[in-house]
Amino acid sequence: MTTTETTAQPWWGKGSVSATLLILFVFAASLAADKWVSNSQLTLPLLLAAVVSMAVAGLGIPRLKALKMGQVIREEGPSGHQSKSGTPTMGGLLVVPVGVILGSWITREPEASQQLLAVSGVTLAYMLIGGFDDWRSLTRRTNTGLTPRGKLLLQTTAAFVFLAIAAWQGWINSSVALPFGQSLPLGLLIWPLGLFVFLAESNATNLTDGLDGLASGCGALVFTGLALQLMLRGNHGDPALAGYCMTMAGTWLGFLVFNRHPARVFMGDTGSLAMGAALTAIALLSNSLWPLLVMGGVFLAESLSVIIQVWVFKATKGADGQGRRVFRMAPLHHHFELGGTSERTLVPCFWTATAALVVLGLLLRPFG
């Protein structure tokens, strides 16, 4: 345990308290939407998914331990993280199917059901890619599994299949909806953009999964934000995709009970890649790329910090092989950690930032 972890923590920095506040915030937002937004029925799928996810995770964690699915911590990471070594990983394998199965039952309307099945398919595909990556890491006892090129190829293939189905069915609007009644017509460019967002978002959520409860809490908030803006757009909203968002939000809230500090389980690439894929698929089908960009600002910042760090280091690298570093360590949460901010303080701050971005995304949501 690091020095910063042993110092007195503010009440909101305690893992159980901050996680409880986050869960209450999401449920309050859902209940408010059901009361005041026409056609909104978000709380039931949220509650059901949270309860089932919590039960499945609670039963599955001992099994992960028995299978010796212990996380390998990279040596070059923050020294305080070495105590996390051996914590069960691949937790996404327990809870992602919960969200997918419950989400697929949200509606019986034929076209909406087909869309939800497509979202479920690409989410499960990314879960399997992440699971294979995690499994390779565990069997090799290293922090790296698949090669970056191999993982990128598999992610691209899964995204391409989803986009091909969406193109065939005519599900995706070629203009990106923006605030104030504006839109950005892209024509055929929407397809390479869609592929890029799949790769960028899934890897951004993956990079965010570096502190106890960080990705699961932020993910639950962003899914909730997407659901709320979907119900606020148009005359009757989009209950099917909004309901699917809430099952995913509930899934990650249930997981958060065990993933909060000190974590009893990690989601691994199994969960983080699936989270990013589900967010992207829903955003593409509902013309919500702009809300996803705003609400997922923490994911974006984490990803950009890595890109900037690598680019500057390579651009300034001298004959001795050393270059400049913009951040103490990337992703961004490690920069703050090495600056002396404890994990238990940092994670609630990132959750709060995400909640603020969700509110901003709702205020700047597209209409119609």
Curated annotation (Swiss-Prot):
Organism of origin: Synechococcus sp. (strain CC9902)
Pathway: Cell wall biogenesis; peptidoglycan biosynthesis
EC annotation from Swiss-Prot or TrEMBL: 2.7.8.13
Keyword Transferase: yes
Residues spanning the membrane: 11-31, 42-62, 86-106, 112-132, 152-172, 180-200, 211-231, 239-259, 265-285, 293-313, 347-367
Location in the cell: Cell inner membrane
Family: Belongs to the glycosyltransferase 4 family. MraY subfamily.
Name of protein: Phospho-N-acetylmuramoyl-pentapeptide-transferase
Annotated GO biological process: cell division; cell wall organization; peptidoglycan biosynthetic process; regulation of cell shape
Keywords: Cell cycle, Cell division, Cell inner membrane, Cell membrane, Cell shape, Cell wall biogenesis/degradation, Magnesium, Membrane, Metal-binding, Peptidoglycan synthesis, Transferase, Transmembrane, Transmembrane helix
Lineage, uppermost ranks: Bacteria, Bacillati, Cyanobacteriota, Cyanophyceae, Synechococcales
Cofactor(s), by name: Mg(2+)
Main enzyme class: transferase
PANTHER family noted in UniProt: PHOSPHO-N-ACETYLMURAMOYL-PENTAPEPTIDE-TRANSFERASE, PHOSPHO-N-ACETYLMURAMOYL-PENTAPEPTIDE-TRANSFERASE HOMOLOG
Annotated Pfam families: Glycos_transf_4 (PF00953), MraY_sig1 (PF10555)
